[in-house]
C-alpha cells in the first residue's frame, strides 16, 4: 500500500485497489473510455477524478514527467496492476495502440 500524493486520506495497492483511510472502505472505480477512474478529495478539499493507472504508477514509482503517459503492457485498460504499467512518450503510446489494433 502507498499513500497517494496530494490525497493523504487514501492508499492504493499495486493492483489499483483504493482505500479510504478515514473509514477503511474500498472505493469502487467507474469506467470512462475504457479506463478505470476514481473520484478522490484532495488535501485542499477539492474532488478530482483520476485514472487509476496513473495513481498506481505515481504512488509506487514516482512522478510522471510532462509529456509521458502510462501504457498498459497487455493492452487491457482495466488491468492496473503495477507490473502491467510502464511509462512511455505520447508518440510511443500512439504507435503501441495502433499496433495492438491490427
State the predicted function of each range.
Residues 1-69, 74-102:
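Conserved recognition-core residues within compact binding domains
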Amino acid at each position: 500500500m502507498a499513500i497517494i500524493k496530494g490525497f493523504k486520506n487514501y492508499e492504493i495497492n499495486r493492483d489499483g485497489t483504493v482505500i479510504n483511510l478515514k473509514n477503511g472502505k474500498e472505493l469502487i472505480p467507474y469506467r470512462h473510455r475504457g479506463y478505470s477512474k476514481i473520484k478522490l478529495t484532495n488535501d485542499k478539499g477539492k474532488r478530482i477524478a483520476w485514472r487509476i493507472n496513473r495513481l498506481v504508477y505515481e504512488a509506487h514509482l514516482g512522478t510522471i514527467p510532462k509529456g509521458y503517459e502510462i501504457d498498459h503492457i497487455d493492452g487491457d485498460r482495466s488491468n492496473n496492476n503495477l507490473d502491467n504499467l510502464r511509462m512511455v512518450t505520447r508518440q510511443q503510446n500512439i504507435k503501441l495502440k495502433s499496433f495492438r489494433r491490427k
